[in-house]
Amino acid sequence: MGKRDKKTKDVFEYMYDDDENGIFWTREFGDLGNWEEEKSCKLFKRTMDTVNSKNNRSMDNLAKGLIVGHTPQYMNNKGINSSCGGKMWRVDIGASKAFGPCTNGDYENKFRKCAVLLIENGDECKIIKEK
């Protein structure tokens, strides 16, 4: 196993950490509550810096954005939405019936309708919604 393999293993261990604050499990980006945009964008920047440094990316191949799931937005009366200059997107609309008890079975909530984040040319984002 060479250095690259060990580095790759370290990146995956970091990313798939079962800790509730691990990158795949944290809900900090989804439910900002009373957080100010500035504070959430500082956390976003730190996360991007960490991801890029852990992946040893060159300056011309840096990850520039983050798509966040596992953070139902209908609870905040929102659908797919972004912050940090359109670089961080929250895409979980709470479509799972598991969230039924949270809305007394209100599956017709306009923020739970099917929606897709379309990304074209690497950075052009458009939300496509069910009518």
Model-inferred region functions:
Residues 1-131:
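Feature recognizes metal-dependent phosphohydrolase scaffolds
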